[in-house]
């Protein structure tokens, strides 16, 4: 089977305090922008719009696409870095489901965290992302959804947050997901 390399580099503003990690982007045919969480069916940008602007459509360019410019400007302003836990995968089916992703090469957390010295926390946005990250952070406790645990990397003590998946396949109302994410941002003093 053919492997697929990650199509985007990490987005790491200089002021990154929070690193948000998903699993791997969907197939390009599902993208509405050339940035993270590009699938118009994914709720991440709606969740962030509700929390920070009181408007789930704050990051829409039009009804069928998110605005890459708005998303990047927001991340720079708030100190949010974005990436994924898988750098190379095999898609067992030609869809966006994490269930059919086989991780060939995971993230190198030290390499990424070295670039963002102000980062105090990592948040993962789904079970596949959590499993992949824990595989490269041995001894780290897996937090329950909506909670965090402490871990060390490169002599830094950090928080690992686990949030609900922003995928529509995770059957929770948007407002409920946003409330869980809001708790994390409040804990970090970012909202």
Which residue ranges define each predicted feature?
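Short active-site-proximal "capping" loops at secondary-structure junctions
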Residues: 25-26, 66
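Internal catalytic-core helix/loop-beta-alpha segment
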Residues: 77-136
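C-terminal capping/extension of enzyme domains
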Residues: 1-10, 15, 26-28, 38-40, ...
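Structural motif
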Residues: 17-18, 121
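Short, conserved, surface-exposed binding loops centered on an aromatic residue
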Residues: 11, 72-75, 114-115
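Short, surface-exposed acidic-centric catalytic microdomains
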Residues: 33-101
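N-terminal nucleotide-binding beta1-loop-alpha1 segment
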Residues: 20-23
């Amino acid at each position: 089977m053919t492997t697929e390399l990650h199509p985007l580099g990490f987005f790491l503003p200089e002021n990154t305090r929070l690193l948000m990690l998903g699993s791997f982007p969907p197939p390009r045919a599902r993208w509405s922008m050339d940035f993270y969480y590009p699938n118009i069916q994914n709720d991440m940008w709606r969740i962030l719009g509700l929390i920070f602007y009181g408007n789930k459509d704050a990051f829409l360019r039009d009804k069928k696409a998110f605005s890459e410019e708005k998303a990047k400007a927001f991340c720079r302003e708030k100190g949010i870095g974005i990436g994924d836990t898988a750098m190379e995968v095999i898609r067992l089916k030609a869809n966006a489901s994490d269930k059919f992703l086989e991780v060939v090469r995971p993230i190198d957390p030290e390499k990424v965290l070295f670039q963002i010295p102000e980062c105090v926390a990592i948040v993962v946005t789904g079970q596949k992302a959590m499993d992949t990250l824990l595989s490269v952070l041995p001894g780290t406790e897996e937090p329950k959804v909506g909670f965090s645990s402490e871990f060390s990397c490169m002599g830094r003590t950090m928080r690992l947050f686990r949030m609900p998946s922003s995928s529509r396949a995770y059957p929770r109302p948007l407002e409920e997901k946003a409330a869980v994410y809001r708790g994390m941002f409040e804990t970090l003093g970012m909202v």
